[in-house]
Amino acid sequence: MRVFIDKLKDKQDLSFAESKNAFEILMNGKASDDEIFDFLTLLSSKGESSDEIAGGVFVLRDKSKRVNVDDCIDTCGTGGDGMNTLNISTASALLLSSMGIKVAKHGNKAVSSKCGSGDVLEALNIKIDLEPKDIEEQIKKNNFGFMFAPNYHSAMRFVGPTRKKIGKRTIFNMIGPLSSPALVDRQVIGVFDKKLLKIFANALNNLDIKFAWIVNSEDGLDEISPYSKTNVVQLKDGKISEMLIDPIKLNIGANKFENLLGDDAKFNANKMLDIFKGEDNDFSKAVCLNAAAGLIVSEKYTIFIDAYNEARTHILSGKTYNDLKEIQNV
């Protein structure tokens, strides 16, 4: 482990192979607490590279319990934007599943916010502690399955205490959203910092992803924002490109940021139920913007505004609420 730590001390990036080797040592419980501490803090102070992130993802995926499903999408973001918004990507995942898109959602309970995806799904009476075969069945039947990260990544136990001791963001906050136990090859990923857009795209390019959108909005969300421009980096078939989504030009008509602020799991779940029943508000529009990205990445649409309009028509019909009841009954 020391050879990698010494390289990081010299502010040198690790290669993909070196990163894989280092994370193998970490995830096999062969590194001391001091080595884990040095490795994670030095990576953070240097700035994590795409090869370092990809190496970590490769190992974490390899050691996770496996969910065997085909052609699914995930909408798992990094979190950590500090905005305490409603659960936009979780709501967009449920909307997409109601629209016929197979979603293997990977997530956790709250870390920096009041309510993570696991918390809000529990508040909606959706089971989050399912085994792989149950999730496979649920996706087959209802187009939606949730993989609760701690149940699937037992190797994380070796680094958990040191991450707590460090007490701030580490490379694991970036590795987690990319480490789906379902090995999805289509993703919409929100990131907490604009500078991660291309880093994530290059990391995913090492990992056999067919189509991904990595997003960060100019008002600081790790989502597509209904209020301000969102920077998007697209990875499709090995090619990386950039674009901008402007809600003013798209005539989204959202009013004020306060309308997206969340609270505890019960509050957030009730807001989600309201929009699934067809209530039209800023939260509904934000969810449809992010679902539109999912429709693009699933290759059901090629034009963003068309995908958005289809998501709007669907959510306002109330059908999402009826489909949610099927997921709750599992």
UniProtKB/Swiss-Prot annotation:
Class of enzymatic activity (EC top level): transferase
InterPro entries referenced in this protein's UniProt entry, alphabetically: Anthranilate_Pribosyl_Tfrase, Glycosyl_Trfase_fam3, Glycosyl_Trfase_fam3_N_dom, Glycosyl_Trfase_fam3_N_dom_sf, Nuc_phospho_transferase
Keywords: Amino-acid biosynthesis, Aromatic amino acid biosynthesis, Glycosyltransferase, Magnesium, Metal-binding, Transferase, Tryptophan biosynthesis
Needed cofactors: Mg(2+)
Family note: Belongs to the anthranilate phosphoribosyltransferase family.
Reaction catalyzed: N-(5-phospho-beta-D-ribosyl)anthranilate + diphosphate = 5-phospho-alpha-D-ribose 1-diphosphate + anthranilate
Record pathway: Amino-acid biosynthesis; L-tryptophan biosynthesis; L-tryptophan from chorismate: step 2/5
Name recorded for this polypeptide: Anthranilate phosphoribosyltransferase
Residues involved in anthranilate 2 binding: R163
Residues that hold Mg(2+) 2 according to the record: D222, E223
Positions with a binding annotation for 5-phospho-alpha-D-ribose 1-diphosphate: 77, 80-81, 85, 87-90, 105-113, 117
Organism: Pelagibacter ubique (strain HTCC1062)
Positions that bind Mg(2+) 1: S89, E223
GO biological process, one term: L-tryptophan biosynthetic process
Gene designation: trpD
Binding residues for anthranilate 1: G77, N108
EC number of the protein: 2.4.2.18
Primary role: Catalyzes the transfer of the phosphoribosyl group of 5-phosphorylribose-1-pyrophosphate (PRPP) to anthranilate to yield N-(5'-phosphoribosyl)-anthranilate (PRA).
Assembly information from the UniProt record: Homodimer.
GO MF annotations in UniProt: anthranilate phosphoribosyltransferase activity; magnesium ion binding
GO cellular component, one term: cytosol
Record note on cofactor: Binds 2 magnesium ions per monomer.
Organism superkingdom: Bacteria
